[in-house]
């Protein structure tokens, strides 16, 4: 179990998880607000 925690805390794994989360977030934003170069929320 300690080896799994050590593996999951390495930089490539954390980078892949954070980039995957960011990509999913951008995909969902573009799904609800298509072609939005600026976000007129004001």
UniProtKB/Swiss-Prot annotation:
Keyword Acetylation attributed: no
A GO-annotated cellular component: photosystem I
Signal peptide: none
Compartments in which it is found: Plastid, Chloroplast thylakoid membrane
Gene3D superfamilies according to UniProt: Single helix bin
TM region(s), chain numbering: 7-27
Biological processes annotated in GO: photosynthesis
UniProt keywords, alphabetically: Chloroplast, Membrane, Photosynthesis, Photosystem I, Plastid, Thylakoid, Transmembrane, Transmembrane helix
Membrane topology summary: Single-pass membrane protein
Entry keyword annotation includes Kinase: no
Xref: Pfam families: PSI_PsaJ
PANTHER family per UniProt: PHOTOSYSTEM I REACTION CENTER SUBUNIT IX (PTHR36082:SF2), PTHR36082
Function: May help in the organization of the PsaE and PsaF subunits.
Similarity field: Belongs to the PsaJ family.
Protein name: Photosystem I reaction center subunit IX
């Amino acid at each position: 179990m300690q080896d799994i925690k050590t593996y999951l805390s390495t930089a490539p794994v954390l980078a892949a998880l954070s980039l995957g989360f960011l990509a999913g977030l951008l995909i969902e934003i573009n799904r609800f607000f298509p072609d939005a170069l600026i976000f007129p929320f004001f």
